[in-house]
């Protein structure tokens, strides 16, 4: 049963925020990402952009909330983390022995939780190898570090930062390596408002470990920990499984999950929730 949005922050002492797609929004980085994939991996940017728009718009065989299996080029639909349908890239159902089984970590699947992972899936589908994908990702992150105002939308950030003093401890956790994200974090002013920023944390498993550490380090109960993020698999699922509170920033209207998290369409809706909890 979903939590009451008006009390989601009541009694919370520790807050953990995701970075990409949470504290900034928008997909202004996508054209640069596709250009890099063309340069490093030969991806057709116009074809890729068309497919990406369909994926993010919910009118493609692969949708936000699905998992893509690059080994078989198949799409796995698992709304409750048990596979109920497998399709090809274009959405045609196929027989697959995995139907009815659960989803686990470390299976080489790409969870489509945001535009970053949607681009990754499109590239893999069209044969861009992992090395070219990695080089493209690194190049676009470097570009973001020097052109964040042009590529990212941080218009809703300041009101959220203004509400953080209510928490005894707050930190940012991101899977992006420090050398690729530290300049962006600094330009957003996050070190001034968070006690720590952790890079390359290997979510979702890294978040599971960090929650365990936080419970002991700050002598808090799970109900006194709040996590805010946009990627359900990486940010929200580990949080609710640990019994903590969660705000899911879901701009794509992903297929509903019967979970206890509060879901919002964008970062602008987060600040009022933090304010209401006082």
Locate each region found by the language model.
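Active-site neighborhood of HAD-like aspartate-dependent phosphohydrolases
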Residues: 2-54, 60-67
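Asp-based, Mg2+/Mn2+-dependent phosphohydrolase catalytic module
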Residues: 1-13, 158-162, 171-278
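Short, surface-exposed acidic
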Residues: 41-53, 127-138, 192-193
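Short, contiguous strand/loop micro-motifs
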Residues: 106, 147-148, 222-223
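A metal-dependent, Asp-based hydrolase signature
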Residues: 58-143
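Short, acidic loop-to-helix structural element flanking the phosphoryl-transfer center
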Residues: 11, 16, 112-113, 145-171
């Amino acid at each position: 049963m979903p939590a009451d949005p008006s009390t989601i922050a009541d009694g919370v002492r520790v807050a953990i925020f995701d970075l990409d797609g949470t504290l900034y929004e928008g997909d202004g980085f996508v054209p640069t990402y596709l250009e890099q994939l063309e340069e490093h991996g030969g991806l057709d940017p116009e074809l890729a952009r068309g497919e990406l728009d369909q994926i993010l718009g919910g009118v493609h065989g692969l949708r936000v909330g699905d998992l893509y299996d690059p080994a078989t080029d198949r799409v796995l639909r698992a709304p409750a983390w048990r596979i109920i349908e497998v399709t090809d890239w274009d959405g045609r159902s196929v027989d697959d022995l995995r139907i009815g089984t659960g989803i686990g970590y470390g299976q080489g699947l790409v969870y489509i939780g945001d535009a970053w992972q949607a681009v990754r899936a499109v590239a893999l589908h069209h044969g861009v190898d992992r090395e070219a994908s990695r080089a493209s990702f690194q190049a676009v992150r470097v570009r973001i570090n020097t052109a964040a105002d042009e590529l990212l939308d941080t218009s809703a950030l300041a009101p959220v930062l203004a509400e953080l003093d209510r928490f005894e401890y707050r930190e940012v956790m991101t899977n992006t390596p420090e050398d690729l994200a530290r300049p962006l974090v600094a330009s957003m002013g996050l070190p001034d408002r968070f006690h720590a920023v952790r890079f390359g944390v290997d979510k979702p498993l890294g978040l599971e470990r960090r929650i365990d550490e936080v419970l002991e380090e700050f002598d808090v109960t799970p109900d006194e920990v709040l996590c805010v993020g946009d990627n359900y698999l990486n940010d929200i699922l580990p949080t609710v499984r640990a019994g903590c509170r969660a705000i899911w920033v879901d701009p794509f209207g992903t297929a509903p999950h019967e979970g206890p998290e509060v879901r919002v369409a964008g970062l602008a809706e987060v600040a009022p929730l933090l304010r209401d909890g006082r």
